Structure formats: C-alpha cells, structure tokens
C-alpha cells in the first residue's frame, strides 16, 4: 500500500497551475503529520518545478527565470544564460539564494545568444506574461529552447499555463522536436480541467536563429487555431449536452394572465395581481 508521502507527492506533482500553495495547505490539513510532512516531499516539489518550468526571481531582481532539467547544475543549483547567473533554488518555497556570476561555456554560445534575442522578441509579442530560456544540452550537441506563460485569475476561479519545450540537434539536422503543453483549471461551482499536449516535428531550412524561431512561431500559431476549433466543437457538442434543459410541458401560455405568474411579476416590477 502506498505511503502517505507517496500519496502526498502525487498531489504535489498534479497541482494545477498557480495552485501549488493551495495543494500544500490541503496536504497539511488532511494528513496527521501536518507541517512535518512537507520536508519529506522535497523530491516531489523538485519534479513539479522542473516539469512545469517553474519561474523564480533572482535575489535583487524583478525578472523571473526558468527552473528546468535543462539548466540544472550540481545539487539544487541552476543557471540562466541571459542574466549570466547561477543560483540555488529552494524547491519547497520556490525561492532563490546564493546567486553567482555564470559564464556560458559552449561551442554554440553565439547561436544560443542569438536564439535568446529572437525568442525574447517572439515571447514579448505573443506571450506578455512569459519567461524563456535557451540552454546547451546533451554534452553541447543540442540546444533546448523553453517558453512558459502563466495566467492566474483566482478571483474568477481559473488559472492557466502554457509550456513549450523544443530541442534542436546542432550539426546536420534540420528538424526541431518538441512539445506544447496547455493546462487550464476552472473551478467555479465545479471542477473542469484542460490538459493537452501536442508533439511537434518542425523542419527548418537552416540553423539560423531567425529561421528556427520563425518556424516555432508558425507551429504554435497553428496549434492555437486547432485548439480554438476544438473549443468551438466542444461548445456545440459535449458541453452543450451538459447544460440543463428546460422541461417541455406542451402547455399553452395564457399571455393575458402572464402578470399573475411569478415570472411575470418579476418582469413587470411586481405589478401583477
């Protein structure tokens, strides 16, 4: 039988966008250990942060940077190419410390910096609340391109997250592989979640930053159009069937007496008999 830690870890890793603190609060309430269980959940917090491309603020900075498996160093240290900084992450609190200067050592440094500049322009145009990163991976034989955008509206009972992860082998390859993840949670008087993943294989004519980001932007635009079409079909199909239908009585309404009905009184300002 799974232990309390295993159950609680699954709750952490399945937390909806922007609701991790709520899940942690519920875990403390539901388990007999209370606050004492949280330190034992550190591995689950780390997996959640890396897979969800959690964003954190560096000490003394306002811009958020990404935490992922692609920019992990030793232990709980990560690096950000754009700010040339490495930093320690407390995965439970999503706070940072011990920031240090970091110099990117990669034979593909020029391409990475060019990709960062072009990706930044793309992100600012299409994803206002976003963070992004470009990192050397696989012993410098490939490049990872990451983008995450969060929109939280708890007052309106919804939160959402967009993530895109691409990998581009440096060399003779002209194909980018990647995935787009969209997660939305709506919870007013119910609980509706959208979790969708789109695998991608994108051909590029050359390995320039402009070509790579242009093809990525096109693929993202096409997927957004696919989602919009799917939403329209769902609204007229599955969702429509969930709406409560008014009963059909086949009785005629006596319009001359409508003022005596409750609805008629409401409409006429209570002037019915």
UniProtKB/Swiss-Prot annotation:
Cited InterPro entries: CapZ_alpha (IPR002189), CapZ_alpha/beta (IPR037282), CapZ_alpha/beta_2 (IPR042276), CapZ_alpha_1 (IPR042489), F-actin_cap_asu_CS (IPR017865)
Organism: Emericella nidulans (strain FGSC A4 / ATCC 38163 / CBS 112.46 / NRRL 194 / M139)
One function term, GO molecular function aspect: actin filament binding
Protein name: F-actin-capping protein subunit alpha
Keywords: Actin capping, Actin-binding, Cytoplasm, Cytoskeleton
Pfam families from the UniProt entry: F-actin_cap_A
One of the protein's GO biological processes: actin cytoskeleton organization
Oligomer and partners: Heterodimer of an alpha and a beta subunit.
GO cellular component: actin cortical patch; cortical cytoskeleton; F-actin capping protein complex
Family indicated by similarity: Belongs to the F-actin-capping protein alpha subunit family.
Functional summary from the UniProt entry: F-actin-capping proteins bind in a Ca(2+)-independent manner to the fast growing ends of actin filaments (barbed end) thereby blocking the exchange of subunits at these ends. Unlike other capping proteins (such as gelsolin and severin), these proteins do not sever actin filaments.
Compartments in which it is found: Cytoplasm, Cytoskeleton
Record-linked PANTHER family: F-ACTIN-CAPPING PROTEIN SUBUNIT ALPHA (PTHR10653:SF0)
Alphabetized PROSITE patterns for the sequence: F_ACTIN_CAPPING_A_1, F_ACTIN_CAPPING_A_2
